[in-house]
């Protein structure tokens, strides 16, 4: 009897903080480290788009907790729909995800072409009505499931004797799983996005295709033992950076904005839930490439207090100016508005306060005298300040009609 009871309809808009939590999560019991900073983001993605998601997951922590044989934390809703998940290697996850996206897109276009041929015939009014509605919102992912279901029902109910129409209907129903617009995602960590898979990632973003990238930024190669990546900030201790990383963190998000037609967002759930929801919703709705970079505290950081405070650490990161919240929306540029929006306020707490609560920074004291540690901390703070000041310049720049 319990299986026959369907969840109640969401009484709120699911792209709001409260409304999103009325949606059934399609990620459960992941087996990740307790308090992991990555899983809350993916859980949220499945609540928003899970019944129509297809995911190419780069190898890394998210592929280990995402599919440790023989189980997977990804599940399905009461209608039997859930994320379609696949894993590829560090070096080709973006290309793999692009292939998944293009394959589904081509099959959907084939179904669309066949449907147009069907409409040229004398078909039922119900088929024409549902087909017209389907075409009208062809690129609308949110409406896609219901419109596709209506179209499938109308085609299945066809009782005419037109042999050609039957042939077209049969061909379309053979492709019915592709009538709905899929939400294509490529998910991976900073080791993949900033380093090993960057060439493929750049290819995907440059393509102009409607595909989404989600980077779980732990600022370290988490799964392979804590090696430094190009995302690791100046001064942090990691494998291959035992004396503290000597150079600045790569600004992957800002690099992506230079294309001009890529939606880019940098988020931290624990710091600003509303901003997180807005950026994710806007990125997915944008008919073009998008990349979201999410700050994810990791057990490798050596957080004093442990991962029980991972969400608080995200808040700390933003309030001290260690991490910044912003987004770049190309649709604003089309209206003559500045596409860069800086959500982070000026730091309200001491930058050093953030560093002092993580072993990856305090371990510097075991290697150097206090004067040297102070110097490294100061350089790290200056690098973060420079980045924030650059974001301010971008957000205040006159653009298009504003000039």
Name each region found by the language model.
Residues 70-83, 276-371, 376-379, 389-394, ...:
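Glycine/aspartate-rich loop-and-adjacent alpha/beta segment that forms the canonical ThDP
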Residues 90-164, 365:
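N-terminal leader/propeptide and maturation segments of large enzyme subunits in energy/redox metabolism
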Residues 17-32, 88-99, 107-123, 178-180, ...:
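Conserved thiamine diphosphate
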Residues 38, 44-52, 58, 67, ...:
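C-terminal extensions of enzymes
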Residues 1-47, 53-54, 63, 71, ...:
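Flanking helices and flexible, charged tails adjoining ferredoxin-like Fe-S electron-transfer domains
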Residues 39, 44, 48, 52, ...:
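Generic, well-ordered alpha-helical scaffold segments in large soluble proteins
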Residues 19-50, 128-187, 192-196, 202:
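Cofactor-pocket helix-loop regions in the catalytic cores of large enzyme subunits
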Residues 65-66, 75, 165-166, 171-290, ...:
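Thiamine diphosphate
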């Amino acid at each position: 009897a319990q299986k026959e009871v369907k969840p109640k309809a969401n009484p709120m808009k699911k792209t709001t903080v409260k409304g999103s939590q009325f949606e059934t999560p399609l990620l459960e019991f992941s087996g990740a480290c307790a308090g992991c900073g990555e899983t809350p983001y993916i859980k949220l993605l499945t609540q928003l788009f899970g019944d129509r998601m297809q995911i190419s997951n780069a190898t890394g922590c998210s592929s280990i907790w995402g599919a440790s044989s023989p189980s997977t934390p990804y599940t399905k809703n009461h209608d039997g729909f859930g994320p379609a998940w696949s894993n590829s290697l560090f070096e080709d996850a973006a290309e793999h995800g692009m292939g998944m996206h293009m394959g589904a897109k081509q099959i959907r276009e084939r179904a669309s072409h066949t449907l147009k041929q069907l409409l040229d015939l004398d078909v039922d009014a119900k088929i024409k009505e549902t087909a017209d509605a389907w075409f009208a919102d062809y690129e609308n992912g949110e409406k896609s499931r219901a419109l596709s279901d209506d179209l499938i029902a109308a085609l299945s109910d066809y009782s005419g004797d037109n042999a050609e129409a039957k042939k077209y209907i049969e061909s379309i129903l053979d492709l019915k799983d592709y009538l709905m617009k899929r939400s294509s995602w490529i998910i991976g960590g900073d080791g993949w996005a900033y380093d090993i898979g960057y060439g493929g990632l750049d290819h995907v973003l440059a393509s102009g295709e409607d595909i989404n990238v989600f980077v779980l930024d732990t600022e370290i190669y988490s799964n392979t033992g804590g090696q430094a990546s190009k995302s690791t900030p100046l001064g942090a201790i990691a494998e291959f950076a035992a004396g503290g990383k000597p150079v600045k963190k790569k600004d992957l998000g800002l690099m992506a904005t230079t294309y001009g037609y890529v939606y880019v967002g940098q988020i931290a759930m624990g710091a600003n839930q509303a901003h997180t929801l807005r950026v994710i919703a806007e990125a997915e709705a944008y008919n073009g490439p998008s990349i979201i970079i999410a700050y994810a505290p990791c057990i490798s950081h050596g957080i004093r207090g442990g991962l029980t405070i991972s969400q608080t650490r995200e808040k700390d990161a933003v309030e001290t100016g260690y991490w910044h919240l912003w987004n770049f929306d190309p649709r604003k540029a089309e209206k003559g508005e500045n596409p860069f929006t800086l959500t982070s306020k000026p730091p309200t707490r001491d930058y050093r306060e953030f560093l002092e609560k993580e072993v990856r920074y305090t371990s510097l004291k075991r290697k150097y005298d206090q004067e040297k540690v102070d110097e490294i901390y100061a350089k790290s703070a200056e690098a973060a300040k420079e980045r924030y000041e650059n974001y301010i310049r971008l957000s205040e720049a006159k653009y298009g009609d504003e000039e």
